[in-house]
Amino acid sequence: MAITRGAKVRIKRPESYWFNEVGTVASIDTSGIRYPVVVRFEKVNYSGLQGVDGGINTNNFAEAELEPA
């Protein structure tokens, strides 16, 4: 199955903060880069400063690291 923009996907990269979480495909790069799929999540990761709203809620993945949710 081809991943398309707006699709809900589950992350299968074990070292990822979002492993087994569901996110939405924000964009897909077709230029041949290693991690072409940008996935957006509802929650942010741990890189935000303590006591300050922030953090990252997107990450790039390869299509092989994603499965439809």
Swiss-Prot record:
Please give, as recorded in its UniProt entry, the membrane topology of this protein: Peripheral membrane protein
Q: Where would you say this protein principally sits, based on its record?
A: membrane
Where does the sequence pass through the membrane? none
Q: Where in the cell is it found?
A: Cellular thylakoid membrane
Q: Which UniProt keywords apply?
A: Membrane, Photosynthesis, Photosystem I, Thylakoid
Q: Name one GO cellular component term.
A: plasma membrane-derived thylakoid membrane
Q: What does the record list as GO biological process? A: photosynthesis
Protein family per UniProt: Belongs to the PsaE family.
Function description: Stabilizes the interaction between PsaC and the PSI core, assists the docking of the ferredoxin to PSI and interacts with ferredoxin-NADP oxidoreductase.
Protein name, per record? Photosystem I reaction center subunit IV
Which source organism? Synechococcus sp. (strain CC9605)
Gene from which this protein is expressed: psaE
